[in-house]
């Protein structure tokens, strides 16, 4: 890497003054970091066109306080070509990361997973759901969410594909005779462990689990990207 340059992506932008922006970036070496982009709202600012989501960037910043100033931003390559549902899925991933990542805590492995996720969304739009579920599981692991999908938390026995297990937060999966929103088939748990979402029922179960697991991190405020996605999906299906 070029000295003093940092690889990163825009997660979120918001107005700071009449001429400037506060920008949340996800960077390889510093994780999520918020930078002041002075003058970025001016019509002829070189930053205006550069600070866009899904564009791999090279960044420089300065400052010693909590809020540092962006001094340079250049595209490292072309913006990833997101289309409709993939675009909203990318916004969803960005919004979740902006909420759950601790400020200036490095997640180098998750950064690589993010890059892979964005690339796959751009090139494999027919696989949006498996791509999102894979990244959500990778993100939970990076956050330290240590659930063992292959072992019963109560007995230590291996998970049986044919049995039902109930999810208990901060504990794991326990064999259960009940069937409700918190229970999962053993075969699905074993697929979660391998990030194998090729089965439609497993894919649906994975979405149910990640919503449960992410809820403590996301809080009660609804995700704006999810609302947008839900609004655009019916129109997309009608037009298709």
Curated annotation (Swiss-Prot):
Cross-referenced Pfam families: RecO_C, RecO_N
Species in which this protein is naturally found: Actinobacillus pleuropneumoniae serotype 3 (strain JL03)
TM region(s), chain numbering: none
Keyword DNA damage applies: yes
Cross-referenced Gene3D superfamilies: Nucleic acid-binding proteins, Recombination protein O, C-terminal domain
Protein family according to the UniProt entry: Belongs to the RecO family.
Source domain of life: Bacteria
Gene Ontology, cellular component aspect: bacterial nucleoid
One of the GO BP terms on file: double-strand break repair
Role: Involved in DNA repair and RecF pathway recombination.
Protein name: DNA repair protein RecO
SUPFAM superfamilies: ArfGap/RecO-like zinc finger (SSF57863), Nucleic acid-binding proteins (SSF50249)
Keywords: DNA damage, DNA recombination, DNA repair
GN (gene name): recO
